[in-house]
């Protein structure tokens, strides 16, 4: 869930950049939090406006190299922290007027192609998938979790129709040999009942493992909760998602705190649900045809945003209960 997928490492292309800038209005100055710094695409564009400051976060320590380059140009207007964005509430922001918090939940192409990270089914590197500040790798998950646990991960995080068959064959094969990236791809391809010629057979399984290894569900949920706490009144929370599970979580969080659902006209106002956000759009913003032509991986991007109506820092949300079944699957990692 870190940085946008881009077609060329040399020409970084942050997805929906123009749309993000028009929403957060850095031309009027202010302090912004870029929760997924990556290659610094959003941050650099924001800092090009003179009265701005950016607090940039990224769990991938390699992002600090690009951050240092920008710090050389923008000096004290950029603060970089190598932390997970779920921890943004630990930042000392008492004297900061946070105008917007931005999340881009994709992966950059250089991360996908890095054999050390082992994120791709095309990689010949170790089955790793750790994006930084991790407790375990995909190799440990694949070689240690049982068939039922692997099936849950593949089904709920990858929406894989053949989850049970693939998990069964993984457990069968690992009793004979350690599962590597190449071996995992072979098992997946041989387990699939139907071939989808539009996408690689291993796409959904590798997505599921990336989500599991990096605990992307709880990371996103706590990131959203803490973003809502730190952003000031009239500030923006903007999130770019790349698959339906992420979008479902973001949509639910924004909607549940943007309206009073099923409120009885007989209920006292003091019992009404907190209306923390103003929801500006009903449907997500998607890339233009031009952007998709220039950057094909952006086709799956969706941008949702809300504006904070009040300066409340304590509020109730049921999002942890709503997605508890997914967090419970992440917690299977306690066995590793």
Swiss-Prot record:
GO terms for molecular function: rRNA (cytosine-N4-)-methyltransferase activity. It is found in: Cytoplasm. Its EC number is 2.1.1.199. Disulfide bonds: none annotated. One of its GO terms (cellular component) is cytoplasm. SUPFAM superfamilies: Putative methyltransferase TM0872, insert domain, S-adenosyl-L-methionine-dependent methyltransferases. Transmembrane segments: none annotated. Belongs to the methyltransferase superfamily. RsmH family. This is Ribosomal RNA small subunit methyltransferase H.
């Amino acid at each position: 869930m870190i940085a946008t997928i881009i077609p060329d490492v040399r020409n970084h292309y942050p997805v929906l950049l123009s749309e993000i800038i028009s929403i957060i209005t850095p031309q009027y100055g202010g302090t912004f939090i870029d929760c997924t710094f990556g290659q610094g695409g959003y941050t650099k564009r924001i800092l090009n406006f003179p009265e701005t400051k950016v607090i940039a976060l990224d769990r991938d320590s390699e992002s600090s190299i690009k951050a240092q380059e920008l710090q050389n140009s923008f000096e004290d207007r950029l603060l970089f922290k190598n932390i997970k964005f779920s921890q943004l509430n630990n930042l000392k922001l008492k004297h900061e007027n946070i105008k917007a918090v931005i999340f881009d939940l994709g992966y950059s192409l250089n991360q996908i192609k890095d054999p050390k990270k082992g994120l791709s089914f095309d990689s010949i590197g170790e089955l790793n998938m750790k994006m930084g500040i991790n407790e375990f790798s995909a190799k440990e998950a694949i070689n240690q979790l049982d068939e039922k646990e692997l099936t849950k991960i593949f089904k709920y995080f990858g929406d894989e129709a053949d989850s049970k068959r693939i998990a069964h064959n993984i457990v069968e094969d690992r009793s004979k040999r350690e599962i590597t990236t190449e071996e995992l791809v072979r098992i997946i391809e041989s387990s699939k009942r139907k071939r989808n010629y539009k996408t690689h057979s291993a796409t959904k399984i590798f997505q599921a493992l990336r989500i599991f290894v990096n605990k992307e569900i709880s990371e996103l949920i706590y990131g959203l909760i803490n973003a809502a706490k730190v952003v000031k009144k009239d500030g923006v929370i903007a999130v770019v998602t790349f698959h339906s599970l992420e979008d479902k979580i973001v949509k639910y969080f924004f909607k549940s705190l943007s309206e009073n659902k099923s409120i009885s006209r007989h209920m006292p106002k003091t019992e009404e649900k907190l209306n923390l956000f103003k929801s500006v759009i009903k449907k997500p913003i998607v890339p233009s045809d031009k952007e998709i032509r220039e950057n094909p991986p952006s086709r799956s991007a969706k941008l949702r945003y809300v504006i904070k109506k009040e300066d409340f820092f304590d509020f109730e949300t049921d999002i942890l209960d709503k997605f508890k079944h997914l967090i419970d699957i992440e917690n299977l990692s306690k066995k590793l």
